[in-house]
């Protein structure tokens, strides 16, 4: 699902393989006479949503001088985005940069197709169970998710990229549980 999407032929084939394996297990229990005394519990680890683009908030933090790139990595920063797929933590090291960072994120959100649905304050984020050390939490809009890079603001998601960049996905998780269809 991460590489190809929720309802992709590849995801459906994987579900069929799991169904066959479960059928083999249940058949073996029946054959061994253990069916009545065995409890089989099947759990799913998480839900996902299809995505079309990855969003990189650090692009604007670097551009605004709130973060510096050295030797291919963000080294010095006053504000930085840390991805959590459908959500993104924004950390601000310098308390005097909180308002500037909030203004920058608000401007990002105002752009057409920003990929950002909501921004939560530190207090709102902590009440949701998020890291109380963050300054903000962003939730991605439908079809988007976050990544930590800085070279560009957005990048097309999907399986065609999976050989060159594992983090470019076609479906992901990490959204708030009140999300429609999640």
Model-assigned labels for residue ranges:
Residues 24-168:
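Secreted, luminal/periplasmic, and some membrane-associated catalytic domains
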Residues 10, 156-159, 181:
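A generic structural signal for solvent-exposed, polar alpha-helical segments
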Residues 1-38:
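A long, amphipathic alpha-helix that forms part
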Residues 163, 169-182:
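Short, intrinsically disordered, charge-balanced linker/junction segments flanking boundaries
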Residues 5-6, 92, 130, 177-178:
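Generic structural "secondary-structure junction" signal
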Residues 3, 58-59, 174, 181:
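Intrinsically disordered, low-complexity N-terminal regions enriched in serine/proline/glycine
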Residues 1-3, 84-89, 182:
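Glycine-rich, often proline-containing surface loops adjacent to acidic residues and nearby aromatics
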